[in-house]
A protein has these predicted regions:
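Serine endopeptidase catalytic core focused on the charge-relay Asp
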Residues: 1-73, 99-100, 113
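A short, structural micro-pattern
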Residues: 7-8, 78, 91, 105
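Helical hairpin unit composed of two closely spaced alpha helices linked by a short loop
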Residues: 65-85, 94
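Catalytic nucleophile loop of clan PA
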Residues: 87-111
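Active-site or metal-binding loop neighborhoods of secreted/extracellular toxin and effector enzymes
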Residues: 115-117, 121-142
Length: 142
């Protein structure tokens, strides 16, 4: 099974025969190279401290700036996003957005959509995050 969507929610799924461990890559840490995902929690307040594990920048953190956001590039309209003030680079898209619970445990909050340009086409550490609930709702059984 290969499934992908570009709109209204941008994500992809691949069914393979392995037993994955739900974890976040944290390779810059000598002690905690994997952070185990314990649960999925929706972000419910501005100012919440969240982190990203990206391929290029690895783990870095910021604060929620806006809930219930949307973005459009003129071709695609995407809602069900929230905005976090944290830096990301090309290649970090698709990385998990998470909240630290304990040293090796995290809560999954979203998936990085990418940097969002402002009116002057500057990113300025503005990051769009796809909500986990919007992804899960696509596959929810009636």
């Amino acid at each position: 099974m290969h499934v992908y969507f570009r709109g209204p929610v941008d994500f992809g799924l691949i069914n393979i025969d392995i037993q994955p461990v739900p974890c976040v890559r944290n390779t810059d840490s000598e002690r905690y190279k994997e952070l185990i995902i314990k649960d999925i929690i929706s972000v419910s307040s501005n100012g919440a401290h969240l982190c990203l594990s990206g391929l290029r920048l690895h783990v870095n953190c910021g604060y929620v700036a806006a809930l219930n956001g949307f973005t459009s590039d003129g071709e695609y309209f995407r809602d069900n996003i929230f905005v976090v003030n944290l830096r990301n680079m090309a290649g970090d898209s698709g990385g998990p957005i998470f909240y630290y619970k304990k040293f090796t445990y995290v809560s999954l909050n979203g998936i990085l959509q990418g940097g969002l340009d402002d009116f002057d086409d500057d990113i300025n550490d503005i990051t769009g995050v796809t909500t986990i609930s919007s992804i899960l709702n696509v596959f929810e059984e009636p």
